[in-house]
């Protein structure tokens, strides 16, 4: 195992326009980091640079005490798990897991021992004699993880490994990856566009956007205190409600743009200090914090639709020209046209600068 250090890492393909802009992060020995963001944000490019599959334009990547910028992938002491399982169809599970060690000249007894140990961890022992065509998608992905485990690397790199699996298998594999990391405690970098994977697997997440690391932090911190409008809108399902508007001179109300109502916001932390009154802001509040509750400031939301999500419901309406969603208990399913008393708890309100996108307060 080893720590992983990224200092000022940049990537450009033409020498002019950068696709990664000065990524700085120190990943502790044994830490599980998730790179999350939309397509084209640079997360997979960054992972490939760590792996040695892409060159580093500027900056430094170090694994342990070694700067690896110019090292070949085979010399970096890493193991990768890909979206595509990349299993040899003519080989058995055991042969697929041990093949990488075989071509490196590792002794047969060592290979057999490592394959047996990995198979036990991943519950693949009954499948060792089977070939890939005889396995389910989840089993194939476990074989791919087993192939990485037997290498006993300093760093695991996961490139959207669950993307090809159905929803039920993804849940199962998330749990298996959690258990695997708890057992091996190997430094891991995991790339995904799926925020549920990011929130459930990561010790820290790096939210990527247009080649920048928008925010780095523990999942709960990123969720509860998003640093930018982008993070606020990207992390969370359903997404945070974000509304442009103007904060009154006395800081008591926020008038939603597009003819929306004046929302009661008095008491929100930072108003009158970091959050200047009498100016435009972007107001954010999560749907689950707007569930009607006694003793909390409220505003009426005309309901135009309601989604049944199973354990709860999601009521939709509009304030001005902004769509607004409110999470409700399973038994509370308002009809179209209902006037819903949406809660606006002061300590759950977020204010963002409309020009910079950065959080205030």
UniProtKB/Swiss-Prot annotation:
Coiled coil: none annotated. It comes from the Bacteria. Pfam families: ABC_tran (PF00005), OB_MalK (PF17912). Keywords: ATP-binding, Cell inner membrane, Cell membrane, Membrane, Nucleotide-binding, Sugar transport, Translocase, Transport. Residues 4-235 form the ABC transporter domain. One of its GO terms (molecular function) is ATP hydrolysis activity. It is a peripheral membrane protein. One of its GO terms (biological process) is glycerophosphodiester transmembrane transport. Its EC number is 7.6.2.10. One of its GO terms (cellular component) is ATP-binding cassette (ABC) transporter complex, substrate-binding subunit-containing. It is found in: Cell inner membrane. It is an enzyme of class 7 (translocase). SMART domains: AAA. It catalyses: sn-glycerol 3-phosphate(out) + ATP + H2O = sn-glycerol 3-phosphate(in) + ADP + phosphate + H(+). ATP binds at residues 37-44. InterPro entries: AAA+_ATPase, ABC_transporter-like_ATP-bd, ABC_transporter-like_CS, ABC_transpr_MalK-like, ABC_transpr_MalK/UgpC-like, Mo/tungstate-bd_C_term_dom, NA-bd_OB-fold, OB_MalK-like. The keyword NAD does not apply. Part of the ABC transporter complex UgpBAEC involved in sn-glycerol-3-phosphate (G3P) import. Responsible for energy coupling to the transport system. The complex is composed of two ATP-binding proteins (UgpC), two transmembrane proteins (UgpA and UgpE) and a solute-binding protein (UgpB). Belongs to the ABC transporter superfamily. sn-glycerol-3-phosphate importer (TC 3.A.1.1.3) family. This is sn-glycerol-3-phosphate import ATP-binding protein UgpC. It comes from Burkholderia lata (strain ATCC 17760 / DSM 23089 / LMG 22485 / NCIMB 9086 / R18194 / 383). The gene is ugpC.
């Amino acid at each position: 195992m080893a720590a992983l250090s990224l200092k000022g890492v940049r990537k450009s393909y033409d020498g002019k326009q950068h696709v990664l802009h000065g990524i700085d992060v120190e990943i502790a020995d044994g830490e599980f980091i998730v790179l999350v963001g939309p397509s084209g944000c640079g997360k997979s490019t960054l992972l490939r640079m760590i792996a040695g599959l892409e060159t580093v334009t500027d900056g430094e990547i170090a694994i342990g005490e070694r700067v690896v910028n110019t090292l070949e992938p085979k010399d970096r002491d890493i193991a990768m798990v890909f979206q595509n399982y990349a299993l040899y169809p003519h080989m058995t599970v055991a042969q697929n897991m041990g093949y990488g060690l075989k071509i490196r000249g590792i002794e047969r007894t060592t290979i057999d021992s490592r394959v047996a140990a990995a198979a036990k961890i991943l519950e693949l022992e009954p499948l060792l004699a089977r070939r890939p065509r005889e396995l389910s998608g989840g089993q194939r992905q476990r074989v791919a993880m087993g192939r990485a485990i037997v290498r006993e690397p300093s760093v695991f790199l996961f490139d959207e490994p669950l993307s090809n699996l159905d929803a039920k298998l993804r849940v199962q594999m998330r749990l298996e990856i959690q258990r695997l990391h708890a057992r091996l405690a190997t430094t891991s970098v995991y790339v995904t566009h799926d925020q549920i994977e990011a929130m459930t697997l990561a010790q820290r997440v790096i939210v990527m956007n247009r080649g920048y690391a928008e925010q780095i932090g523990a999942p709960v911190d990123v969720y509860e205190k998003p640093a930018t409008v982008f993070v606020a809108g990207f992390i969370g399902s359903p997404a945070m409600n974000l509304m442009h508007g103007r904060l009154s001179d006395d800081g008591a109300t926020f008038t939603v743009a597009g003819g929306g109502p004046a929302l009661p916001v008095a008491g929100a932390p930072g108003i009158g200090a970091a959050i200047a009154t009498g100016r435009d802001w972007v107001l954010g509040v999560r749907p689950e914090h707007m569930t009607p509750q006694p003793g909390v400031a409220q505003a009426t939301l005309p309901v135009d639709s309601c989604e049944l999500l199973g354990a709860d419901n999601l009521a939709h309406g509009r304030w001005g020209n902004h769509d607004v969603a409110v999470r409700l208990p399973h038994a509370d399913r308002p009809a179209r046209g209902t006037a819903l008393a949406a809660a606006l708890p002061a300590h759950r309100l977020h204010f963002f600068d409309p020009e910079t996108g950065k959080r205030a307060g």
